[in-house]
């Protein structure tokens, strides 16, 4: 081990720790050679990665710009203020906190800021496409609060707004959550606002999956309808891992800031905030808007190909980057199907579908997403090919080995991270 000096500051991972270097190289190779179709994943730019690995890694900056508990925070203040300015411009809001380490912590901060333990929360059922932090029984949000859940309609698998209203009137929730992790259609934030007003509830919009689409103007904005919006900064925003909390209320941002620090977190990860600032700047460009339009076109192409091949695509298609398929008609399970696709280099995830009778680690569905491979440069032609490969594999019309060769041939044409 090197104690310090010039060598310490110049040594590369490959020289200092070959074991870690080999693992990183292996992951780079995996990302290059496989098709990354997990809806919550994306590829960050080289600029984002550079900021994430910057010397801000070294800096402790407990508190907020202009009010820190440590000295030497001049540049930490500058980068955090820049991130806040950019994200507020991106989503058309007045206030932002860019410090949450994850989407789950962002949601937890809103709970801490606005609720008391035992308060009633109305959220989207995990089984219908919601998220763990929307009141799932295994999550803190379901353990500390009285969680009630709305579902999708059985006829079209879209959010049942009649049920939302009925449950809100019956249970008088302190907060209603509008958001999802496995839902491919538009969310009607205006109707959620009307229901929240009827029962005097806060409205939280958790748009972690849709944030990039919203920023590009290709998905309904939660503002001005929600009281608070949360989102991760990776996924469709194409930034580093982390999260944001946004609002137009000065009163609420004070409560949220206190909930995040000192309520939940200590020092913010300034290197991650620097990377978020870069990602927000990228998302403000016209190039990002065109990228998001391609993301949606590619997802629609994938959904159309799978539907034409006889697969049951939930909701009949997609408005977003997410494509969900129901495998029950083919007598297939999500876990087995996901592993089969992975063996050919197609990476997706097993996913429960609405009213699924299978266990969470089995499931009856698969979830696909288009953001990562769109970032890589693939367009509708490639996604049509990918859809055909998925169908051929699941219908056993092609061997895994042959499919793997075709995947490798495709991915080799779209190389990246050439470092």
UniProtKB/Swiss-Prot annotation:
Cofactor(s) listed in the protein's UniProt record: pyridoxal 5'-phosphate
Pathway of action: One-carbon metabolism; tetrahydrofolate interconversion; Amino-acid biosynthesis; glycine biosynthesis; glycine from L-serine: step 1/1
UniProt keyword annotations, A-Z: Amino-acid biosynthesis, Cytoplasm, One-carbon metabolism, Pyridoxal phosphate, Transferase
Biological process annotations from GO: glycine biosynthetic process from serine; tetrahydrofolate interconversion
N6-(pyridoxal phosphate)lysine sites (modified residues): 235
Pfam family, one: SHMT
Cytoplasm as UniProt keyword: yes
Enzyme Commission no: 2.1.2.1
Family note: Belongs to the SHMT family.
Assembly information from the UniProt record: Homodimer.
Function (record text): Catalyzes the reversible interconversion of serine and glycine with tetrahydrofolate (THF) serving as the one-carbon carrier. This reaction serves as the major source of one-carbon groups required for the biosynthesis of purines, thymidylate, methionine, and other important biomolecules. Also exhibits THF-independent aldolase activity toward beta-hydroxyamino acids, producing glycine and aldehydes, via a retro-aldol mechanism.
Name of this protein: Serine hydroxymethyltransferase
Origin species: Neorickettsia sennetsu (strain ATCC VR-367 / Miyayama) (Ehrlichia sennetsu)
Gene designation: glyA
